Design a protein with these regions (language model features):
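Non-transmembrane, aqueous-exposed alpha-helical and coiled segments at domain scale
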Residues: 123-125, 133-135
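An extended, acidic
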Residues: 1-113, 117-122
Length: 137
C-alpha cells in the first residue's frame, strides 16, 4: 500500500482477468498468475484480438501432466512462449455468460425465451462488441 499498488487475488476466471488488463477503463496494469494450458491459449486469442501481448511458460504439477503434454506433441516444455507462439493468423474469440460477471451478464429466463450475452472479438475486422441474443424456449 505504501507504493500505491493494489493487488487483487482471483481464484477463478483467469481468462477474464487477462482480458481486463487490455481494457483501458479497468485501471489494471499487469496480470500475473498460474492457470491451465487451455485457458492460456484462450487468453492469448483474446489478447491477440485486442492488440495486446503476453508471455507464458508451462508449469506442470507432476510427471503425469508433463507426459500428457509430450503426448499432445508439445516439444518446448521449459521455454518461454510469446503470444505468437500460441495463436497465429486471424483470430475470433467469443465468450457467452452463463452467470453474471464483469464482462457479460448471465443467461436470463424471460417469459417465452432465454436472454444471453456474448462478448465477441475478431482480429482482422477489429471487432470488439457484446451481442445480446434471445433464444426461444
Amino acid at each position: 500500500n505504501s507504493m500505491g499498488v493494489k493487488i487483487i487475488f482471483i481464484s477463478d476466471g483467469d481468462v477474464l482477468g487477462v482480458i481486463s488488463v487490455a481494457d483501458p477503463k479497468s485501471n489494471i496494469d499487469i496480470y500475473l498468475g498460474t492457470g491451465g494450458g487451455p485457458e492460456g491459449v484462450l487468453a492469448a486469442a483474446a489478447l491477440s484480438c485486442l492488440n495486446s501481448q503476453m508471455q507464458t511458460r508451462l508449469v506442470f504439477q507432476d510427471d503425469d501432466e508433463k507426459n500428457r503434454a509430450k503426448k499432445l506433441g508439445i516439444k518446448g516444455l521449459n521455454i518461454k512462449y510469446n503470444m505468437n507462439d500460441m495463436v497465429k493468423g486471424d483470430v475470433i474469440f467469443c465468450a457467452t455468460g452463463v452467470t453474471d460477471g464483469n464482462l457479460v451478464k448471465g443467461i436470463k429466463d424471460v417469459r417465452d425465451y432465454f436472454e444471453a450475452e456474448t462478448f465477441v472479438l475478431h482480429k482482422s475486422s477489429n471487432t470488439n462488441k457484446i451481442i445480446k441474443n434471445k433464444i426461444k424456449k
